[in-house]
């Protein structure tokens, strides 16, 4: 998905945003994820409970937070209203957000905010 030539978020090839050359311009790529994604409720070998989703997100966050002590990290979580919006699933997201907000030096934001930050600081 590309937003008005500002950034694209249809890449899975890295953990942090990066620039590519597009013609004579630079195109910002903001990576997306398939593993920290509620779409796994709808696929084989995916999540079959909110608790599994929560545990996977928590384990991913814990690993990245530890790694982030030496360099910045980004954790993308893919969410779709028709999937995460179910009562048994939304609780796992609320529980995860409650967990991570207890940590210092984290930023919970939208992809567009990441793009704006990257454009401002790393153009």
Residues covered by each model-derived region:
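Active-site-adjacent pocket scaffolds in enzyme catalytic domains
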Residues: 4-71
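C-terminal domain-boundary segment and adjacent tail
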Residues: 58-123
């Amino acid at each position: 998905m590309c937003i008005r030539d500002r950034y694209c978020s249809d890449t899975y090839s890295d953990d942090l945003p990066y620039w590519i050359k597009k013609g004579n311009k630079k195109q910002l790529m903001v990576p997306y994820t398939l593993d920290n994604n509620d779409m796994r409720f709808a696929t084989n070998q995916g999540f079959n409970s909110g608790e599994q989703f929560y545990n996977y997100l928590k384990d991913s966050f814990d690993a990245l937070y530890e790694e982030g002590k030496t360099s910045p990290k980004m954790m993308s979580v893919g969410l779709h209203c028709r999937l995460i919006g179910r009562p048994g699933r939304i609780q796992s997201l609320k529980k995860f957000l409650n967990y991570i907000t207890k940590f210092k030096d984290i930023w919970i934001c939208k992809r567009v905010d990441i793009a704006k930050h990257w454009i401002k600081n790393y153009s």
